[in-house]
A protein has these predicted regions:
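A catalytic-pocket lid/entrance helix-loop region that shapes and gates access to the active site
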Residues: 2-51
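Residue-level signal for short, function-critical loop segments
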Residues: 7, 133, 245, 272
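Alpha/beta-hydrolase fold active-site neighborhood
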Residues: 55-233
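Alpha/beta-hydrolase-fold serine-hydrolase catalytic core, especially in secreted/extracellular enzymes
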Residues: 135, 294-306
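Short beta-strand/loop motif that positions the catalytic acidic residue
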Residues: 234-235, 240-243
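Conserved alpha/beta-hydrolase "acid-adjacent" motif
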Residues: 248-253
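C-terminal soluble interaction/assembly domains
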Residues: 255-274
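Catalytic histidine-centered segment of alpha/beta-hydrolase-like enzymes
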Residues: 272-285
């Protein structure tokens, strides 16, 4: 049994979504950090915040309003010209005021264009999709700088309609599964975040997480099933469990809730991303193939793809 990026059963499902809020924010910052580290190649900025701003400007051009997801921490290189003397304390002030700044800019743009919705930006949707997939980060960066666009071919209206129907069905199915199997009460403290994201910002990095994290997603419906019992004690070959330190979907700090009852042998992938076997990480692939052939796990650590 190979458990790739195992979730915590104790968080199913409202808790999983709540944990993904910080997970996706950190994952987004890791993505921008990767691009900034390779500025000589991508020319999008030498700090994560500079890349974030270039990205935000493109989202705003597509949607009419800027994105509101949490910006990365500022560095000394982000200080405005003439304020370099402020050093790290100045950068820390920029970091502390960053969330309020992006919300204020969003509201200013929203007032000018009331019908503008940030989720209408194809780039924003693409970003949310690719944050957990480091193998696509290079292609994403080239798309962002315009050197190699990733835009899919335009579908005909009928194909687009069917795609939208399929997406709606998938969301309804997810809702049924989540609410039928949920074992974690909603957190009412997340209701303000949900209401703001649902009725004002339409921030895809917050909307779904707060929808279920707050409990609003199930609308008071009681679960039909409970937590499934897990016990790996009778398995002759114990599972191999692969967990990444920067996983936005199943955050690393919760992995023992699965590994302990399953008696898994955990391999920690030191890097970002969700699902690492057969995802272009040769070291992880070799570990997984060796395990599937022999049942042996000879290491506890592996490098991330990024």
């Amino acid at each position: 049994v190979l458990l790739d990026s195992g979730m915590s059963p104790k968080l199913a499902w409202n808790g999983i979504f709540a944990s993904q809020q910080r997970g996706y924010e950190k994952g987004l910052h890791d993505l921008f950090g990767f691009i900034a580290k390779n500025d000589a190649k991508y020319h999008l900025g030498s700090t994560p915040l500079q890349v974030y701003e270039k990205w935000s400007q493109k989202v705003a051009r597509e949607a009419g309003v800027r994105p509101t997801v949490l910006p990365p921490n500022a560095k000394i290189g982000d200080l405005p010209p003439g304020l370099e003397f402020a050093g790290q304390p100045g950068a820390d002030i920029m970091t502390a005021t960053g969330p309020l700044r992006v919300q204020a800019e969003f509201l200013s743009q929203k007032i000018q264009q009331p019908n503008a919705v940030q989720v209408s930006s194809p780039l924003l949707g693409m970003t949310r999709l690719l944050v957990p997939i480091p193998a696509q980060w290079d292609a994403f960066a080239k798309h962002l700088n315009g050197s190699e666009p990733m835009d899919a071919e335009q579908s005909d209206p009928e194909a687009l309609r069917k795609e939208q129907e399929s997406l709606a069905q998938a969301m309804n199915m997810q809702n049924l599964i989540v609410c039928n199997e949920n074992t974690v009460p909603g957190n009412p403290l997340l209701y303000p975040s949900y209401l703001w994201a649902n009725f004002v910002s339409a921030d895809p990095f917050t909307l779904i997480n707060s929808l279920y994290g707050s409990g609003a997603g199930c609308g008071g419906r009681a679960p039909v099933t409970g937590q499934a019992p897990l016990d790996g004690s009778k398995l002759a070959t114990k599972p191999l469990q692969i967990q990444a330190t920067g996983d936005p979907q199943t955050p690393y700090q919760y992995h023992t809730s699965l590994s302990k009852p399953m008696q898994s042998r955990v391999v920690t992938v030191h890097g970002p991303g969700h699902a690492h076997f057969a995802s272009q990480n040769k070291v992880v692939d070799d570990i997984g193939v060796h395990y599937l052939r022999t049942g042996e796990v000879t290491t506890t650590d592996a490098p991330g793809l990024i």
